């Protein structure tokens, strides 16, 4: 069993190292920065199923690090939640296949409401309807899932998470986000205490 677990780790690490690092990353950061920090919009993330859970994590991590973001469930968007979208926002949609019906429909609904809102896509395939609808798309490298059936999102969601982490860290650098900024947004728990220590906030409060 240990050897099998090591093999799983190795395959997932290989998938991460094989993520295509293209100009799309810089383009995505430029779009998010322009819309959120230049126009006071927000980053709206979306995905269905396991990809949706990754999209939700990306949204909360962006928000914690100075870039206002929120997750929009693609199905709930069709029942009124699309109203959360505003004209200066940017939509980040995630779909490994690039063919997820609910995400394609979400972009179509977005176009009916605010066609000027740019769309960034994270996908495993550039030759898909979703990539065609994107202003910018980031490819995952379409890694094979480590799932025994080759079906359950495993490696693909790992790669999506890493891509999201890269975007977050690049944006933190771009906006000069520091420990003091973090402490103001993450007051509770160990990380809140640590960020206040790093920023000297604890000493100022005493």
Question: What are these language model-derived features?
Answer:
Residues 1-37, 41:
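An N-terminal, well-structured beta->alpha segment
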Residues 33, 42-175:
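Glycine-rich phosphate-binding loops that contact phosphosugars or nucleotide phosphates
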Residues 37-47, 64, 193-205:
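Short, charged low-complexity intrinsically disordered segments located at boundaries
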Residues 132, 146, 173-206:
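Internal, active-site/partner-interface "lid" segment
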